[in-house]
Amino acid sequence: MIKTNDFMEIMKGRRSIRNYDPAVKISKEEMTEILEEATTAPSSVNAQPWRFLVIDSPEGKEKLAPLASFNQTQVTTSSAVIAVFADMNNADYLEEIYSKAVELGYMPQEVKDRQIAALTAHFEKLPAQVNRETILIDGGLVSMQLMLTARAHGYDTNPIGGYDKENIAETFGLDKERYVPVMLLSIGKAADEGYASYRLPIDTIAEWK
């Protein structure tokens, strides 16, 4: 359920929260809603390569704990930790995505046919490393949107990059060659307010030509 639609409050009130109220659980229905809203994020050629592993059971968290040894508080107290992956087989879903766009009236059939033909040729010769770099960017976009969506629902998050990326896919039965780790996101009800942080001024980080 949406708690606020005030975008500035959502964005500027976001904090990286490490300690959560362990009594607060997020239902599968609400988590599904949060993920659906987050996946309105943009992606290259609308391939939507993001994949989510929602780790919310005691057994799942027990598996995750040794892979995130420096982030134990987030793992143990959060409602869930979402492992965000990027799918190297992203091109496999283009037919489904573009066909559904035609069915829903978002795209004419002739545009879909032309796009699929061009994209099929593109992906056949696309170097794996270039595809990997692209889907990681897409994974970052959806992760940021997920954090903001969580805030709209009244929850807080913490993006985690310090974990065992080499072994997380296989630990949870996923193909490590196919699923590229993007980040972990803890989510739940903050037990602490978190800290405000300084941002560099625009004069330092931007220039006009």
Swiss-Prot record:
Belongs to the nitroreductase family. It is an enzyme of class 1 (oxidoreductase). FMN binds at residues 14-16, 72-74, 161-162, 199. This is Putative NAD(P)H nitroreductase YdgI. The keyword Transcription does not apply. InterPro entries: Nitroreductase, Nitroreductase-like. Pfam families: Nitroreductase. Its cofactor is FMN. Its EC number is 1.-.-.-. GO terms for molecular function: oxidoreductase activity. The keyword NADP applies. Keywords: Flavoprotein, FMN, NAD, NADP, Oxidoreductase.
